[in-house]
Amino acid sequence: MDATIYSDGTYLRNNPDWHADDAAWKAGHIARMLERHRMRPPTVVEVGCGSGEVLVQLSQQLAKGTRFTGYDVSPNAYTLCANKVDRHLDFRLGDYLQTQEHHDLALAIDVFEHVEDCFAFVRALRARAKYKIYHIPLDLSVLSLARPGKLMAMRKSAGHIHYFSRDTALALLEDTGHRVVDWFYTSGATELGNPGWKTRVMKLPRNALYRSAPDAAARWLGGYSILALAQ
């Protein structure tokens, strides 16, 4: 897939709010991970910050002394986040990995499935922050593979060019030199508002199976991501 979709308006047309509607939900899970490990990072950078709304929401939940910086290579995304700057929060148009900056915590939230060489991206990010938090959609499931066109539709609308299961997502982190400290599932399919009718129909079986067998729910029915904390 041509990466120009992020600068020529294609991705913005397909995703007009650049997923800002999901930001409070994502920020809540990030804050939950940090609280589990009693982490209070003085500096936080989000790589591929999109609309910037995840950092806006996170800045309202973490300690007031924390400094937040968001980077995105897309001019379209930058137009959405540039007006959200305040004295604790900054946004920059550019590639964080081309800078010399280093932060206490780096966030890559639904990012590396869009990157052509995702291994090189994740390997480079590992060296640029003490801790990293990755949110990784688990697009591979029995249900998604059984539905003709599902993954290709995701490729076209969301720009996903790599597809992961729980095991392959965690293996990618380990293969790029990370030590996975902790991880947990998130379920956009059952926790986010305004789902389509197919997602609504699947909510009950997803919740029922997840309560007794979360790995099986993710593997068979899909609709899940993982949030991983790594060094």
Question: What label would you give each PLM region?
Answer:
Residues 115-116, 129:
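Helix-to-beta-strand junctions that scaffold the AdoMet/dcAdoMet cofactor pocket
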Residues 124-128, 135:
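Conserved helix-to-beta-strand junction in the class I
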Residues 135-160:
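Short, glycine-/aromatic-enriched active-site segment of Class I SAM-dependent methyltransferases
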